[in-house]
Amino acid sequence: MDVRPLHHPSLEDITVEGILHALSDPVRVAIYADIVAQECSHNCSMFLNISDKAIPKSTLSQHFRALREAGLIRGERRGVEMYNTSRCAEIERRFPGLLRAIVNAHAIQSKDEAQARKLAGKRSSRRSVKNN
């Protein structure tokens, strides 16, 4: 079986622009925030449902590739499975505070969005009660 090696940029080749581009996608930032929070390697299939949305495996693979090529994660093949870990500690040395700020901002935004969905659900249930 011919398996191509995964590309992991050296720390010196990681750029702020590359990081910001990789994390500009809501699915990728959610994946990355989860990997950082768990501090252990994750099998790609753990992310088939992000933010209550089903994601096809092929799309998920592309998201992981973007994160890996930006230098945010390190991928490791174990048999047929791929496990990913954060390179947060390495990047922190190069760009102190950058990833922490992004992950914290994502957490605030996610909390606000969850509250808005909850509030919208209450409003719609009140409307259906009024209509009955």
Segments (PLM) and residue ranges:
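Conserved acidic functional residues
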Residues: 25, 63, 96
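Canonical helix-turn-helix DNA-binding module
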Residues: 47-75
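Short amphipathic alpha-helical segments, especially helix-boundary/capping motifs
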Residues: 4-9, 20-23, 38-40, 64-66
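N-terminal helix-turn-helix DNA-binding core of bacterial DNA-binding proteins
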Residues: 18-56, 78-90
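Generic signal for short, ordered secondary-structure residues
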Residues: 2, 10, 14, 26-27, ...
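Amphipathic alpha-helical dimerization/coiled-coil segments
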Residues: 2-15, 33-37, 87-132
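Secondary-structure transition/capping residues
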Residues: 42-43, 55-58, 102, 110-113
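A generic structural-conservation signal
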Residues: 76-77, 101
